[in-house]
From Swiss-Prot:
Disruption phenotype: Loss of growth on lysine as sole carbon source. Inactivation also leads to a decrease of virulence showing the importance of LdcA involvement in polyamine homeostasis during infection of the host. This is Lysine decarboxylase LdcA. One of its GO terms (molecular function) is lysine decarboxylase activity. CDD domains: Orn_deC_like (cd00615). Pfam families: OKR_DC_1 (PF01276), OKR_DC_1_C (PF03711), OKR_DC_1_N (PF03709). It comes from the Bacteria. InterPro entries: OKR_de-COase_N, Orn/lys/arg_de-COase, Orn/Lys/Arg_deCO2ase_major_dom, Prn/Lys/Arg_de-COase_C, Prn/Lys/Arg_de-COase_C_sf, PyrdxlP-dep_Trfase, PyrdxlP-dep_Trfase_major, PyrdxlP-dep_Trfase_small. Its EC number is 4.1.1.18. GO terms for biological process: amino acid metabolic process.
């Protein structure tokens, strides 16, 4: 199998190309290794060797010259540095020192901690070249044999055996694709290994995802250790499904559940599927439209009792909740002190579910200590804790690759057999093994110091990007405009991450969330929100402004897609896949936007897709003209304040979400135009994208108190007509074209 991996051996030796006996023997070792199937990378330069060792993360072994290093401080430092950089991402990589007579025997004591990581010293003149090469080959083979995590290793080994397939899938390891021209194209694009490793549950040596056996069970157990969980389960169809599994395993009909209103729609689907009665936790929201934290007081027994008393569906019930769910971190990168939430809830809930879809990396850096589900302490009265991760979002895994992590409570332990009934209800009996392997690899990549270094590198890139934006501002005229960064003032220009610097202080102006609890929430440095001119965090609108939708569209035209766009802010994510080249390109394009805006260049040149969508509407319109017109529309309609209002005032509850959905399924609903929605009960959820948070849930009533929702729907339609090319997306809002134009409707319960 080691030959299939094609991991080379790196040789760093000053005589590798020299006409010396030592050089000849080093080249002889390289030749023997090549004969054994290894490829060779070689250099005479220590500096180049360090670069290769630090950037080439697919090495089988390193041989480094160390003759006389004990007495030569510079040479010793070169050897030590190479060991350090190579071991950051590959802690078990075998590294041999090459010597002739004396190597590191006389090295100072302070270097020994690094030098002891050497696999050994090979003296070029003491043994035959073939013998020395075999020492290297054995160490490399052993390293590579133990490199792959359990499920991925079993999958690679099975694929390498080239077994004939008499089971599903029908393409038979890719053979069927080669019988058709379009199939041949598919085969060439995805490659032999991808198709040969697309297997079925009929292959027993890979274990079972549904029964958690074999190498698959080993992979889940290893992931549990890495993420700090008592149990971990691999999910192959996304965290939407992972959330439903958690709820179906823990929540029954008419159970009370405490729900973050800033939640993914899969949580709302879970409420419908289980028939639970929701009590909502309302997060803060600032004037910029950035979703803030749920006040800590919302988790207290008194607050829960008040919510039960206020709910027509729960009134009279004891203040005991089956499950509470919190989105951590928020879409905008606010991370809760999970320990504080757990303590405040006390024994009020049996199950605490952290939806950490965007936060799978938190366990691997001390910056996030105590701020993620599996990082909380245990107590006798503590709840059973679940964390659901979209591993594919921020770690290295295939799309739809997710995990469920579980921490047993003091007296509440996970009943694995009962849980697995819900797991099997939602997981395919024909799992995609490539997705499973990617979960196994994602977990293995984060083990030990290698995982921390990957997160630290992401921090470094995000901080460099933040500094680059600050540097541009400093070089502009004081009265000129530039993009802002939503962050604490004290972190501008910093190149180090300290948790205390990123914690939101109560009533600080920059965040706009008021008097939040001490040490309760921090801003994640790798989620960067950029602000555009026009609106302050306090809600003050300026005369001129640049709506963020225009900037995002400009970037999209140039192949840069941001994660989320608000009225005057947009979010960019720094994952492990972001490099200096990528964020430098973003800075360059932001500078280009400024140039085009300042020059008021025609939309036809800078936003051709918008110009095409608008036709005559945009004839003669420049980029600044469009920005001014859109800003005026937001200002005249007080859009920012209206959006804050519609998310902070909850609609009236009329029936359980599951009851409303039952009526939808039975056809006991009708399409109601926006103008006639007041007083009606919604049969569907209304979810604007972005941010993807529901305005109204099935079973909730449109009333005068939530008039801002109806105003927003009307405004969104008017806005689309005024600014073609900038369509709003509201899930649940339908339209019908008639003689008098387009009519927008919402499915409501028949009365």
């Amino acid at each position: 199998m080691y030959k299939d991996l094609k991991f080379p051996v790196l040789i760093v030796h000053r005589d590798i190309k020299a006409d010396t006996v030592a050089g000849e023997r080093v080249r002889g070792i390289a030749h023997e290794l090549e004969q054994d199937g290894f490829s060779i990378l070689s250099t005479a330069s220590s500096a180049e060797g360090r670069i290769v060792a630090s950037t080439h993360h697919g090495l089988a072994c390193i041989l480094v010259a160390a003759e006389g290093a004990g007495e030569n401080q510079r040479l010793l430092q070169d050897v030590v540095e190479l060991i350090r950089v190579a071991r950051v991402r590959a802690p078990q990589l075998p590294i041999f020192a090459l010597g002739e007579q004396v190597t590191i025997e006389n090295a100072p004591a302070e270097s020994m901690a690094d030098l002891h990581q050497l696999r050994g010293i090979l003296y070029l003149f003491e043994d035959t070249v073939p013998f020395l090469a075999r020492q290297v080959a054995r160490a490399a083979r052993n390293y590579l044999a133990g490199l792959l995590p359990p499920f991925f290793r079993a999958l690679v080994e099975h694929t390498a055996q080239s077994n004939y397939s008499w089971h599903t899938p029908g393409h038979g390891g890719g053979v069927a694709y080669r019988k058709s021209p379009v199939g041949q194209a598919f085969h060439q694009f995805f490659g032999e290994n991808t198709l040969r490793s697309d297997l079925s549950v009929s292959v027993p040596e890979l274990g079972s995802l549904l029964d958690h056996t074999g190498p698959l069970a080993e992979a889940e157990d290893r992931a549990a250790r890495n993420f700090g969980a008592d149990h971990t389960f691999f999910v192959i169809n996304g965290t939407s499904t992972a959330n439903k599994i958690v709820w179906h395993s823990m929540v029954g009909r008419e159970d009370l559940v405490l729900v973050d209103r800033n939640c993914h729609k899969s949580i709302l689907h879970s409420i419908i599927m289980t028939g639970a009665i929701p009590l909502y936790l309302t997060p803060e929201r600032n004037e910029l439209g950035i979703i803030g934290p749920i006040p800590l007081s919302e988790f207290s027994k008194q607050s829960i009792a008040a919510k039960i008393a206020a709910s027509p569906l729960a009134r009279g019930r004891e203040p005991k909740v089956k499950l509470a769910v919190v989105t951590n971190s928020t879409y905008d990168g606010l991370c809760y002190n999970a320990e504080l939430i757990k303590q405040t809830l006390g024994d009020s809930v049996e199950v605490l579910h952290f939806d950490e879809a965007w936060y799978a990396y938190a366990a691997f850096h001390e910056f996030y200590d105590g701020r993620y589900g599996m990082g909380t302490s245990r107590s006798e009265e503590g709840p059973l804790v679940f964390a659901t991760h979209s591993t594919h979002k921020m770690l290295a895994a295939f799309s739809q690759a997710s995990m469920i992590h579980v921490q047993d409570g003091g007296t509440r332990k996970l009943d694995v057999a009962r849980f697995n009934e819900a797991f099997m209800m939602h997981i395919s009996t024909s799992p995609q093994y490539g997705i499973i392997a990617s979960l196994d690899v994602a977990s293995a990549m984060m083990e030990g110091p290698a995982g921390r270094s990957l997160i630290q590198e992401t921090f470094d890139e995000a901080l460099s990007f933040r500094r680059a934006l600050a540097n541009v501002r400093q070089n502009l005229d004081r009265n000129d405009w530039w993009f802002g960064v939503w962050q604490p003032e004290q972190v501008e220009g910093t190149d180090q991450v300290g948790t205390h610097d990123w914690v939101l202080e109560p009533s600080a102006d920059w965040h706009g969330f008021g008097d939040i609890a001490e040490d309760y929430v921090l801003l994640d440095p790798i989620k960067v929100t950029l602000t555009t001119p026009g609106l302050s965090a306090g809600g003050k609108l300026s005369e001129q402004g640049i709506p963020a939708a225009i900037v995002s569209r400009f970037l999209w035209e140039r192949g840069l897609v941001v994660e989320k766009t608000g009225l005057y802010s947009f979010l960019v994510l720094f994952s492990m896949g972001i490099t200096k080249g990528k964020w430098s390109t973003l800075v360059t394009e932001l500078l280009e936007f400024k140039r085009c805006y300042d020059a008021n260049l025609p939309l036809l040149d800078v936003l051709p897709s918008v110009a095409q969508a608008g036709g005559k509407r945009y004839n003669g319109v420049g980029l600044r003209d469009l920005s001014d017109a859109m800003h005026a529309s937001y200002r005249d309609n007080a859009t920012a304040k209206a959006m804050k209002r519609m998310y902070t005032v909850l609609p009236e509850v009329a029936m359980r979400p599951s009851e409303a959905y039952d009526k939808l399924v039975r056809g006991e609903v009708e399409a109601v135009p926006i103008a006639r929605l007041e007083g009606r009960i919604a049969a569907v959820m209304l979810v604007p994208y972005p941010p993807g948070i529901p305005l109204i849930m099935p079973g909730e009533r449109f009333t005068e108190a939530t008039r801002s929702i109806l105003d927003y729907l009307e405004f969104a339609r008017t806005f689309e007509r005024a600014f073609p090319g900038f369509d709003s997306d509201v899930h649940g809002l339908q339209h019908q074209d008639g003689p008098s134009g387009r009519c927008y409707t919402v499915e409501c319960i028949k009365e």
